[in-house]
Design a protein with these regions (language model features):
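Feature recognizes metal-dependent phosphohydrolase scaffolds
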Residues: 1-650
């Protein structure tokens, strides 16, 4: 061990070859430890709603407005502060409007630049100069650094800053400078972003959200059930491919696949129009508002039915191939009496709402027709060979996982599978039993195998496991006894649609259970929390996102308009800054145009979950622990230099 430690110190001495350099680094790191911790922003359940997501990202769930309030307090009217905040969110668009209304743009530029500089100073104050420098736009890096850095040696600071601002306006770079300052404020306001699941689902722009996240300065992702579904589809898993297309068709968003990812759906469309030519497909109507022509709508509905039937067949094959999944009860096609148009479920007969199944052979209901097989082969190749989709999924794999422990918070989407008594449920995965953290880790390992395993069998298991995670009752990302897709389409009886939730959801107020979950993931003591995405909080019914005395924070971003009628709000986001935890409840997002024109913001109400007595500093964070280890190693190196065990390289 001593030899290993000495070799490590020798390697460290190559980076810090002198006492002076090692000492300077210790001083620098110690200074960083004393800075306030950076602001963390938690978003979840974005569901493809790009506009609302982009707005929340720009305003930091109210963090930008709080900075404006902190800087200007009562010296500026609420209306002016909101106008300044809107400018920071949408600098280009806001300036286009101002130019139409303002008579003296030079004065407006001057006032606005001074205000933005003050906000930028406040926002940058919690970071090292080095970190701020890395965030500066190249074109204006030097000038911005001059403007936001205090210069004690200047006797006439006002004159110095005035000259810089006047020059910016004189050379007609004010607009570009305002944009640069606004984007810098946005970036510095949030130090790190957590996406607690479900970038994908029913909304029209998940691919745009992924592009945005790939440009974000610091982000991690906890996969949601819909994210896993898309990952499985990208890996070529047929059950996942069929589900992805069905959900896009159901919400009138097939253009995500066709335009966003360039996946050719023409063979499916041709097949659907041929096989269901005279079928109104009434059970497969589109959800949400769409702007289709009658002809386009008819085609989407027929495609919706065609891919749904293919899905039920393909899933039947997966279930038969994987008896260990214990999902035989979800194979329903062989229970249909095709002559009578009924189905037998749990000994009870139900009449089907749709009785037209031209592609199902009653003797072999799970066998794809030659045309269906050809369609699935083409789709499988299309998903596997789509460069943009593969790039997005690699990003999810690189930045994501099923859970994350970060600064004493446990982040995950969905639930921890529990028994009725609150103990952790034992789940069998390919012959071995797992529970709690081990279950998460083995499932995540299979997801990665589905993309990267060299052995064909392991790769196939990994792909099938992504489909399992999407809809199995023992999956942490699903947590219900069944996914009643077939019943919702074909049966009128609501009792057949019921999906019973895992006991986890009814035990979130049980402190013993919550503490056992936190302990399972290595967390104990004060100021520890579970941040849980996936479940909409029905605020209009008096439901609270704060559970178990503040130990559990159930946040669903509520970006999906479909849930907003149920919940009464547009969901919650969470901010964790140096002063504590703040939950923000959002009003529904009207539009980007309304946000710019009216200055309307979607954050409506903030709830302080926990206010810390002493301001949290970097030394209190995970980064702080790593920096302390680095300081300790450097102090060992200094000791080795001073004792003569290692010689300085001067």
């Amino acid at each position: 061990m001593e030899d290993l430690k000495f070799k490590y110190l020798e390697r460290l001495s190559e980076i810090y070859p002198t006492i002076a350099q090692a000492s300077t680094e210790v001083i620098n790191l110690q200074a960083i430890l004393n800075l306030p911790k950076g602001t963390e922003h938690f978003l979840t359940d974005i569901h493809g709603e790009y506009e609302a997501f982009a707005h929340v990202l720009k305003n930091g769930s109210g963090s930008v407005r709080r900075k404006v309030d902190a800087v200007f307090g009562n010296t500026m009217s609420s209306r002016d502060k909101q106008a300044l905040a809107t400018l920071i969110y949408y600098p280009r668009e806001k300036m286009d409007r101002v130019k139409k209304e303002e008579n003296n743009m030079e004065d407006w530029y001057k006032i606005t630049l001074y205000r933005l500089i003050e906000v930028c100073k406040r926002t940058a104050s919690k970071y090292t100069r080095s970190k701020v420098r890395k965030a500066l736009p190249k074109d204006f890096a030097y000038v911005i650094e001059e403007l936001i850095t205090e210069k004690a040696e200047l006797t006439d600071k006002e004159s110095y800053y005035n000259e810089i601002v006047n020059t910016i306006i004189r050379v007609r770079r004010a607009e570009e400078f305002i944009i640069a300052l606004s984007e810098l404020i946005q970036r510095l306001t949030v130090d790190h972003l957590h996406i607690v699941g479900d970038i994908y689902d029913r909304g029209p722009g998940p691919h745009i959200i992924m592009d945005k996240l790939m440009q974000y300065h610091s982000v991690d992702i906890q996969w949601g059930n819909h994210d896993i579904l898309w990952m499985g589809a990208a890996a070529g898993q047929r059950g996942c491919i069929a589900n992805v297309i069905r959900i896009c068709a159901r919400y009138g968003n097939l253009d995500i696949l066709e335009d966003g990812y360039g996946i050719n759906l023409l063979p499916l469309a041709t097949f659907a129009l041929s096989k269901y030519a005279d079928d109104p497909c009434e059970c497969f109507g589109l959800k949400g508002s769409t702007s289709f022509t009658a002809q386009e709508k008819e085609m989407e509905i027929k495609m919706h039915k065609a891919i749904s039937i293919i899905q039920f067949k393909v899933e039947g094959q997966i279930i038969r191939k994987n008896p260990g999944f214990k999902m035989e009860g979800r194979n329903l096609l062989h229970r249909i009496d095709f002559e009578k148009g009924t189905i037998d479920l749990d000994g009870q007969k139900y009449e089907l709402l749709d009785k037209n199944f031209p592609t199902i052979d009653p003797r072999h209901p799970y066998t794809l027709t030659k045309e269906e097989e050809d369609i699935m082969e083409r789709l499988e190749r299309a998903f596997l060979n789509c460069e943009k989709l593969q790039e997005h999924m690699r990003f999810l794999l690189n930045k994501g996982g099923l859970y994350k422990v970060y600064n004493n918070n446990l982040l995950y989407h969905g639930c921890i599978p529990l028994n009725e008594d609150g103990s952790m449920k034992q789940v069998k995965i390919y012959g071995k039993t797992y529970k709690g953290k081990e279950l998460y880790e083995v499932l995540e390992s299979y997801v990665r195998k589905g993309f990267f395993a060299v052995e064909t069998k392991e790769k196939e298991r990994g792909r099938d496991m992504m489909w399992y995670i999407w809809l199995n009752e023992n999956s942490p990302l699903f947590g219900k006894d069944k996914m009643a897709t077939f019943e919702r389409y074909f049966l009128a009886e609501k009792e057949t649609h019921l999906e019973k939730k895992n006991p986890y959801y009814s035990l979130l107020e049980n402190e013993k259970v919550v503490d056992s979950i936190l302990a399972e993931f290595g967390l104990s003591g004060e100021c520890i929390h579970i941040v849980n995405g996936h479940v909409p909080v029905r605020s209009k019914n008096g439901e609270s996102p704060i559970k178990c005395g503040g130990k559990v924070l159930v946040i669903d971003g509520g970006f999906s308009k479909a849930y907003q009628k149920e919940t009464g709000i547009a969901g919650y986001t969470l901010i964790y800054n140096s002063y504590g935890l703040i939950l923000t409840a959002h009003d529904p997002f009207e539009s980007t145009e309304a946000a710019i024109e009216k200055g309307s913001d979607i954050h409506s109400d903030s709830i302080i979950v926990k206010r810390v007595m002493a301001r949290k500093r970097v030394e209190d964070t995970d980064d702080g622990k790593r920096l302390k280890e680095r300081i300790r190693d450097l102090e060992f190196l200094l000791e080795a230099y001073r004792s003569g065990r290692i010689t300085e390289k001067i």
